[in-house]
Each structure stands twice: as structure tokens, then as C-alpha cells.
Amino acid sequence: DSLNNMNERIILSSMDGFEVYKIADIIRCEANGSYTTFFIKEDRKVVTSKTLNNFEKLLSDLPFVRVHSKHLVNINYIKKYISGRGGYIVFEDGSQVDVSERKKKEFIRLMKVHARST
């Protein structure tokens, strides 16, 4: 069940070892070449030397969605979506990421599945 999986932990390798985080605390992940930066609750950032594709597969059964070639987001932290060509997402912490035109339709579909809409 997806909720139980969100309580699981993820090991993120760092330069000097690794750190363990609750999956539920991950707000979003951002690709930077062959590195991925994790944005975690309480303004924490962790850079790992694995690609975003790797983490997209690892988190595929959870409420994470790829909204752009550079962005994998936890939909539980989305505050609002501003439409446009692709549009962009605003998170609870005030940060923003673009949604690509190609990913927009699937993103909106998944949001409606995971949240009650009016």
C-alpha cells in the first residue's frame, strides 16, 4: 500500500558516505546532468551521483510524478498549479518548478487521481 511505502526510508549516497531519509519527507528531486539534488523538508538538500531516471523508477509506485525532464515531484507537497504552455507548480515551501508541455496532461491526470477536486 502506497501510504506504508511513504513511511519507508531511502538511502542517499553522499561524498562522505550516505544519509537516510523518510521517503515522505522528500519534496522534489531535480536533475543536474548525471547528478540528482533532493529537496527535503526543513530546507535540507542532498546531492547524489545517480540520475533522476534511477530515482523515478525507484519511486514509481508512490505519489511522485515526473513533470519535466529535470523534475520529479512529490504531489503531496504541491500547493498550486499555474497553467500556461506547460505551466508551473508552486510547493508548500514556496519553491517553483516548470511543467513541460509534454508532461502536463499526465501530471493533471495524476493530481486528480490523488486529490479530490471540485
Name the predicted role of every residue range.
Residues 109-118:
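Short, charged, intrinsically disordered terminal tails
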Residues 32, 107-108:
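General helical structural elements
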Residues 1-92, 96-98:
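Conserved binding/recognition cores within well-folded domains
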Residues 100-104:
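Short, Lys/Arg-enriched C-terminal cap helix and immediately downstream tail that follows
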Residues 56, 108-109:
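A cross-family signal for key residues in well-ordered alpha-helices
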